[in-house]
Amino acid sequence: MRVSRSGVFGVLLVVVVLATLGGYSFYRGYAAGASRLGRVMAWLRNPGAHPDWALQAGDRCGNAPFAYPTDGFIGFLWGDSFRPGHRHQGLDIFGGQELGQTPVLAAYPGFLTRLPDWKASLIIRLPQDPLQPDRQIWTYYTHMADEQGNSYIAPAFPPGTQELYVEAGTLLGYQGNYSGDPDNPTGIHLHFSIVLDDGGGSFRNELEIENTLDPSPYLGLPLSAETNQGEIPSCG
């Protein structure tokens, strides 16, 4: 989710218009998203004022199988929407530090791939879904580069890396703001998602929410916008 000034005003305008036209049931989801947007802006302005919002990389919530992949505040959830037809496919976690400073760790062991043209992204194959062992899934990590595409991915994973085994907690890189458009970078964060297998041993298109999974049970937190109507994700 981009958090440039123009983007913020655009999102708020969409929320107001849809609230007027769509009625309460339609508005409720957008209102929750707008509430999260306000918190993201507050966090980016002064992370130190909200230490209770932050999660620590490598920690786990109870018996959840995945560790938190990075430090920071989970600002936007799976299923969040700020325009008609769009639903966010994963989580946006904002570290609150400068570019290239907030570590990104593997949430679960698996086999890492970085495609040759990936400047900011990695994907890890999990041969057995820990919650449904009869299927294979993938964990996806992105925005690990600056606005010009200078990568913050760890040197151990150069472009073209294929099927390299990594343990949970392995350093993958650092949070960045790469969007593909140098004139409109994202806020500094990690986008993390869980992607379904295509049935042929590869991953589906992560840009479509139907190809991703609700991360709530994997991280033990309320991370679906459909059911989380403004709660700050925390363990306990």
Q: Residue ranges of each PLM-predicted region?
A:
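A generic structural signal for short coil/turn motifs at secondary-structure boundaries
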Residues: 100, 148-152, 181-183
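Active-site loop architecture of trypsin-fold serine endopeptidases
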Residues: 175-189
